[in-house]
Amino acid sequence: DLYWEEIEAPTEDLKGTEKYYSFHLPAEVNRVKGLTAIILKDALDEKDLPQMERREGQDWIGLRIRHKGKITDLYINQLADGRLMHSNSWIMPDGWMTDAYMFAVSYPEGTEAKNAKDFFIAYGSALRRGNETYFSSLAKLFVIQKAEGKKLDLWIDGQPKINTTFRSTKKPVSVEVNDKKIPVVYQKSQIKVKL
């Protein structure tokens, strides 16, 4: 089991000592990744806090967060942390397929993740599920996608020029990228964004 101990050791300037924490793992490993969630309460007596469930799979770790009728699945790709720059870093968590370092998908409780319209993608070039492409780019990007009614809001960063597509089952009335309206280019359930 994972456990930690408090150790007293010299300070950086060697003029005193201070306490450090040493983590001990159940097996010898050459790298460790962790996930920390900090929840700030709005009031001292607040009781309605998000419920978090730790999750993991082949080459990924993550959380399922449930709060006020909404589920957010957060995934961290353990292959895409920058050490394997020219190696394949694709993972397949819960039916998704991506090369993103981190991604999250939010959807109403009682519905399926495949019908989600809100996504966060950190340093990724694609997000797929089955035969559906939810996001595709020739470059790795940072993306936030939020669909409300017939409007699609996108925040995209990471490259000076953007050429990407996003899945939308219906043609939106308007598309905004980084708070600027762009023409809606829609074909075969895909919205094209070129900046």
Predicted segment positions?
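CBM-like, beta-strand-rich accessory domains located in the C-terminal region of large
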Residues: D1-S168, V173, V177-L195
